Amino acid sequence: LKVVIAHGGGYFPHYLGRMDRNHANRPDTVKNTGGRKPSEFLRAFHYDTCVYDPAVLSVLAERVGTDRLVMGSDYPVGEKDPVGWIQGLALPSSDVEKICGGNAARLLGLH
């Protein structure tokens, strides 16, 4: 199963400390994780880039890796130029290429 979470995963990537702490303190409340912490599941998903803040996207890229990010448009309310927004970030060109199409192509089995 391939899952892409909208809006950069929302609060999920930024809430990991709390989830891991609660998991450690109350393992009886978490079932079927195979002993894994919630943060260990983060890279199982893909995330779109509709976060509207370069600092937030930077944290997301650091936590999940740029290979898990796909460009999102958030149509009809999103960035007027979502590709240009990604290109304007302080990312290596190889990461920009992955985010702007390479990752989606891989995710969809197009190459």
Please place each PLM-identified region on the residue numbering.
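Catalytic pocket-lining loop regions of alpha/beta-barrel enzymes
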Residues: 1-70
